[in-house]
Structure formats: structure tokens, C-alpha cells
Curated annotation (Swiss-Prot):
InterPro entries: Neur_chan_lig-bd, Neur_chan_lig-bd_sf, Neur_channel, Neuro-gated_channel_TM_sf, Neuro_actylchol_rec, Neurotrans-gated_channel_TM, Neurotransmitter_ion_chnl_CS, Nicotinic_acetylcholine_rcpt
Disulfide bonds: 155-169
Extracellular side: 26-238, 289-300
Protein's membrane topology: Multi-pass membrane protein
The species this protein was found in: Mus musculus (Mouse)
Protein name per Swiss-Prot or TrEMBL: Neuronal acetylcholine receptor subunit beta-2
GO terms under cellular component: acetylcholine-gated channel complex; cholinergic synapse; dopaminergic synapse; external side of plasma membrane; plasma membrane; postsynaptic specialization membrane; presynaptic membrane
Site note Key residue for a rapid dissociation (K(off)) from the conotoxin BuIA, residues: 136, 144
Entry's family note: Belongs to the ligand-gated ion channel (TC 1.A.9) family. Acetylcholine receptor (TC 1.A.9.1) subfamily. Beta-2/CHRNB2 sub-subfamily.
Gene3D superfamilies cross-referenced by the UniProt entry: Neurotransmitter-gated ion-channel ligand-binding domain, Neurotransmitter-gated ion-channel transmembrane domain
Record PROSITE patterns: NEUROTR_ION_CHANNEL
Keywords, in A-Z order: Cell membrane, Disulfide bond, Glycoprotein, Ion channel, Ion transport, Ligand-gated ion channel, Membrane, Receptor, Signal, Synapse, Transmembrane, Transmembrane helix, Transport
């Protein structure tokens, strides 16, 4: 029983001792805060300097937590950053032995003096941080303040290589009311911290260098600038924009492979042109309305639109050639040589067999006509008789001798006069039909030649269009691969324009 009472007394003593120590610790921190923020010795409106000429050195460092978005059209970058600020305040010092060896204390940031460091190139009017967190104060007067903030900063968007582009968006920090003679801003680190960074699905972080800028013409000017060098991830725009454009352009190639007789050449050309116009309107809603550069996708769309317009013009010319006839156009000899003999071989076109056979027959007939074979049916002249044009002359001579020998037969010969006129008319009709068929055959051959010329022109422009599209597409989209984007390049371009107040 005595042991139990002793144990209870021991536990009670330990509990009372722990409670007293906690109360004493709380009392110590409370006494320290009251000591530091005593209105009689501390005024948060006064700069922590012993005299007017003393500089207050403020160390800055940006920690990027998240790259929220980059709005290309409005040219605004939204980021979630932690702005580290460190300085010394001689009024917030104490001796640790007077306060139970307490070396650090956290004070509300709105109750102490703060350097009014703001984002100078903000785009929404929110210059200050969004949350005033507590400041960590050490016994030697050094203050560590890490407020989080969501900044919207102005960013000049370079659209030349969109969507394979890299951007340099800057964040410029400086004191709003204090100049260099009162506050000296220095970099705590040459690069921004990425220890707590959440990766973005649209951008890759290339480099985050920081620099301290001074103006030679103004000795009171100083700022801290961080360069956010970021590269776009092009997969989204490649799948949703570039590949559809390439496929639509490939449809324009089929215009030259489409037969002219189907009547859908112009319809296909106009449809492709309208589709490209829709994509061009989509691009205009994404990129900023600038006249300094044309985005890469916009250049490609304009390139394809020019090609499609060219295909429309060539299709009109091909259709015009396709529907020509001997009554409207005469085929020049050089057209026959170039488009019927030379180009088909170069373009790997094989002439149809029936066309070759018809051409051989036509050449053979013309050769016979030149040799006098046109007298196959009958000869014109005073001794020619239509009734005897298809009769063997030897038999005619024998028949004539028989008629002369017998007087009765002479009367029969005279009675055949009306028959002679009918036969002449029949022969004239046969000759007219033969001439008409020959003319129709010649006209049909000429029309077939014009159609073949149109097909050769179609095939010629097909190969030209294929080569121009392939090499033009490769040449345009290989440009971003040869661009040499480095942090030094961006920084050199920024240093070329000196900062000023």
C-alpha cells in the first residue's frame, strides 16, 4: 500500500513539473514577443537603420512551386512562387539567456517592418503577396520571411516557332518606395529554386537564372530579375493541329489523281481550302495578334492554302484542255511532241493500245491519200462513168464491143440512162458517208489526244505538288530543331535593352 502511494506521488510530481515547464515556456515566448514589439521601442513604420545613410540589405530568392499557365493571346504568365526575403533588424535582438535560451521566435509579418518588394511587371494589379505568413526572427536580428504568392506577370510571347517554341518570361522585383540609397537588393542564389516544383503538363523548365540589374544613368535604381526560360511540349498541338493539317494537305494531292470526267475536281479543291481556312481561324484565336512574327503553324497553313489555290488554277486549266475539240482549238505541233511523245515517257505513263492502233491507222490512211489512193472508189474525169466504177475495165470493153456489134443492144444501152443517174447519186451518198465517218474518226482522235494531254498535265502537276508538299513540310517543321535556344541567348537579348526606372 505504501509502494502504491509512493508511485502515485511520483507520477503526480512529474506531471506537475511538465505542466509548469510548458507554462513557463509559453510565458517566456509571450514575454519575448511583448519585449520585441513593445511600442515604446519598436515602430514598424521605420526602416531598420541606425542612421539615414545606412543601407538595409535585403536578400531575395524565388522558389517556383508551380507554373500554372502561360496565356499566349493575353501574354500573361501565371506562377505560384515563394518569395524568400532575408534582412536584419537591429531592434529585434535579444539575449537568449534572458529568455530560457530561446533563439528564434515567429512574429506576425504585419506587426514588423517589411521591405515593400513587389512584382514590377505584374499584369493584374496585384503587386503584393497573397498571404502574409509569419516571419522567423533570430536573436541576432536576422529575419527570414517566406510568403507564398500567385503572380500574373507580363510576358512577351515569341510566336515564330509556335508550337515548337521556347519563351523567356521575366519576373522583375524591386522596392516600390525605397531606392538603392536606402535598400540594397541582392541575390541569395543565382538560380531560382525548384525543390518544391510541381511539373507542368504543357511546359518544360529549361533554366531559371536570376540577375541583379543596375542602371548606369540612375544610381538609385536596382532590381532583381528572374528569367523563366521554358519550352513548350508540342504533343498536344501536334496531335490536334499539325497532323490534321498534313492529312488535309494530302487530300489536295488527290485532286491531280482524280479523273477529269468525274466532275468533282473543283469540289474537292474548294472543300480542302475551306478546311484549311477553319484551322487558320483556330490559330488566330490561340496566338497573340502581333505583326512582328507569323507562327510556324500559320506559315504552314498559308503555304498549303497557296498550294491548294494553285491546284484550283491548274484544275481549271486541265478541265479546259480536257474538253477541247477540233472545232474550238487546233493542237500545235509542239504540244504533240511535248505532251504526247516526250512527257509520258518521263512521267512513266503508258499510252493505251487502242490509241496507238488508231494512230497507226490514221497515219497509214494519210500516207495512202498522199500517194493518190483517194481514187479507190472512182476517178473524176470525162471518161469516168459512175455506173462502171466498180466493174472490171476488161469486161466493160467486151460488153461495149458486144453492144456496138448488135444494133438491138444499142437501144438497150440508151435505155439505161436513168439508171446511170441513180447510180451516180448512190455513189455520191456513199462517198459522203465515208467522208463523214472519216471526219468523225479524225475528230474523235483529236479529242482523245486533248484528253490525253490533260491527263499528262495532271500527272505532271501531281509529281510537282508531291515534291513541293513533302519538302516544304519537312523544311518548315525542321526549322525549330536547328534553333539554338540557350539561357545565354535569351539573357543576351535582354541585356541589350538596359533597365530603367
Amino acid at each position: 500500500m505504501a509502494r502504491c502511494s509512493n508511485s502515485m506521488a511520483l507520477l503526480f510530481s512529474f506531471g506537475l513539473l511538465w505542466l509548469c515547464s510548458g507554462v513557463l515556456g509559453t510565458d517566456t515566448e509571450e514575454r519575448l514577443v511583448e519585449h520585441l514589439l513593445d511600442p515604446s521601442r519598436y515602430n514598424k513604420l521605420i526602416r531598420p537603420a541606425t542612421n539615414g545613410s545606412e543601407l538595409v540589405t535585403v536578400q531575395l530568392m524565388v522558389s517556383l512551386a508551380q507554373l500554372i499557365s502561360v496565356h499566349e493571346r493575353e501574354q500573361i504568365m501565371t506562377t505560384n512562387v515563394w518569395l524568400t526575403q532575408e534582412w536584419e533588424d537591429y531592434r529585434l535582438t535579444w539575449k537568449p539567456e534572458d529568455f530560457d535560451n530561446m533563439k528564434k521566435v515567429r512574429l506576425p509579418s504585419k506587426h514588423i517592418w517589411l521591405p515593400d518588394v513587389v512584382l514590377y511587371n505584374n499584369a493584374d494589379g496585384m503587386y503584393e503577396v497573397s498571404f502574409y505568413s509569419n516571419a522567423v526572427v533570430s536573436y541576432d536580428g536576422s529575419i527570414f520571411w517566406l510568403p507564398p504568392a500567385i503572380y500574373k506577370s507580363a510576358c512577351k510571347i515569341e510566336v515564330k516557332h509556335f508550337p515548337f517554341d521556347q519563351q523567356n518570361c521575366t519576373m522583375k522585383f524591386r522596392s516600390w518606395t525605397y531606392d538603392r540609397t536606402e535598400i540594397d537588393l541582392v541575390l541569395k542564389s543565382d538560380v531560382a529554386s525548384l525543390d518544391d516544383f510541381t511539373p507542368s503538363g504543357e511546359w518544360d523548365i529549361i533554366a531559371l537564372p536570376g540577375r541583379r540589374n543596375e542602371n548606369p544613368d540612375d544610381s538609385t535604381y536596382v532590381d532583381i530579375t528572374y528569367d523563366f526560360i521554358i519550352r513548350r511540349k508540342p504533343l498536344f498541338y501536334t496531335i490536334n493541329l499539325i497532323i490534321p493539317c498534313v492529312l488535309i494537305t494530302s487530300l489536295a494531292i488527290l485532286v491531280f489523281y482524280l479523273p477529269s470526267d468525274c466532275g468533282e475536281k473543283m469540289t474537292l479543291c474548294i472543300s480542302v481550302l475551306l478546311a484549311l481556312t477553319v484551322f487558320l481561324l483556330l490559330i488566330s484565336k490561340i496566338v497573340p495578334p502581333t505583326s512582328l512574327d507569323v507562327p510556324l503553324v500559320g506559315k504552314y497553313l498559308m503555304f498549303t492554302m497557296v498550294l491548294v489555290t494553285f491546284s484550283i488554277v491548274t484544275s481549271v486549266c486541265v478541265l479546259n484542255v480536257h474538253h477541247r475539240s477540233p472545232t474550238t482549238h487546233t493542237m500545235a505541233p509542239w504540244v504533240k511532241v511535248v505532251f504526247l511523245e516526250k512527257l509520258p515517257t518521263l512521267l512513266f505513263l503508258q499510252q493505251p493500245r487502242h490509241r496507238c492502233a488508231r494512230q497507226r491507222l490514221r497515219l497509214r490512211r494519210r500516207q495512202r491519200e498522199r500517194e493518190g489512193a483517194g481514187t479507190l472508189f472512182f476517178r473524176e474525169g470525162p471518161a469516168a462513168d459512175p455506173c462502171t466504177c466498180f466493174v472490171n475495165p476488161a469486161s466493160m470493153q467486151g460488153l461495149a464491143g458486144a453492144f456496138q456489134a448488135e444494133p438491138a443492144a444499142a437501144g438497150l444501152g440508151r435505155s439505161m440512162g436513168p439508171c446511170s443517174c441513180g447510180l451516180r447519186e448512190a455513189v455520191d451518198g456513199v462517198r459522203f458517208i465515208a467522208d463523214h465517218m472519216r471526219s468523225e474518226d479524225d475528230d474523235q482522235s483529236v479529242r482523245e489526244d486533248w484528253k490525253y494531254v490533260a491527263m499528262v498535265i495532271d500527272r505532271l502537276f501531281l509529281w510537282i505538288f508531291v515534291f513541293v508538299c513533302v519538302f516544304g513540310t519537312i523544311g518548315m517543321f525542321l526549322q525549330p530543331l536547328f534553333q539554338n535556344y540557350t539561357a545565354t541567348t535569351f539573357l543576351h537579348s535582354d541585356h541589350s535593352a538596359p533597365s530603367s526606372k
